[in-house]
Amino acid sequence: MLPLYLLTNAKGQQMQIELKNGEIIQGILTNVDNWMNLTLSNVTEYSEESAINSEDNAESSKAVKLNEIYIRGTFIKFIKLQDNIIDKVKQQINSNNNSNSNGPGHKRYYNNRDSNNNRGNYNRRNNNNGNSNRRPYSQNRQYNNSNSSNINNSINSINSNNQNMNNGLGGSVQHHFNSSSPQKVEF
């Protein structure tokens, strides 16, 4: 059982909390949020020294009584619960589950990812949905290769004309001229 889940179901129970600075707070839990920030009522707060010494000593006068206190979850060192609180929470959860499942209009909603034998295939599309217009991508691939030989021939002629430009001395400028209309380039 997760600590946050335990605390949310333990509202109304007496508990003792030690903070990171050594203070001890005793009270009744009234509210818990997702960051484990607590609100306690009927609170007694003890400083570090009075918690260490016995209650018969004069140091016990450092105890402070408060109606309510709010404690940030980041300041909590540990929480001491009553011995039987886990059993009470389990009984409370079971009684809530039994009362909710027998009510009228009760439906259980399951995660649809696990249905239709698609376990583990969450990102795959099911193309067998009865829609004949949808085909897998591989069946729709068609290439127009009629001009590919002409393109390859022109690329080869450009590369053979410009091989003397690429002499390994760094970058070079390659000019592509049409043989039917010669052009002059001045540098």
From Swiss-Prot:
It comes from Saccharomyces cerevisiae (strain ATCC 204508 / S288c) (Baker's yeast). Its main location: nucleus. Component of the heptameric LSM1-LSM7 complex that forms a seven-membered ring structure with a donut shape. The LSm subunits are arranged in the order LSM1, LSM2, LSM3, LSM6, LSM5, LSM7 and LSM4. Except for LSM1, where a C-terminal helix crosses the ring structure to form additional interactions with LSM3 and LSM6, each subunit interacts only with its two neighboring subunits. The LSM1-LSM7 complex interacts with PAT1; within the complex PAT1 has direct interactions with LSM2 and LSM3. The LSM1-LSM7 complex interacts with XRN1. The modification Omega-N-methylarginine is found at R119. This is LSM complex subunit LSM4. The keyword Metal-binding does not apply. GO terms for molecular function: U6 snRNA binding. Present with 3440 molecules/cell in log phase SD medium. The gene is LSM4. GO terms for cellular component: cytoplasm; Lsm1-7-Pat1 complex; nucleolus; nucleus; P-body; sno(s)RNA-containing ribonucleoprotein complex; spliceosomal complex; spliceosomal tri-snRNP complex. The modification Phosphoserine is found at S181. It comes from the Eukaryota. Signal peptide: none annotated. PANTHER family: SMALL NUCLEAR RIBONUCLEOPROTEIN SM. Keywords: Cytoplasm, Methylation, mRNA processing, mRNA splicing, Nucleus, Phosphoprotein, Ribonucleoprotein, RNA-binding, rRNA processing, Spliceosome, tRNA processing. Belongs to the snRNP Sm proteins family. GO terms for biological process: cellular response to glucose starvation; deadenylation-dependent decapping of nuclear-transcribed mRNA; mRNA splicing, via spliceosome; P-body assembly; rRNA processing; spliceosomal snRNP assembly; tRNA processing.
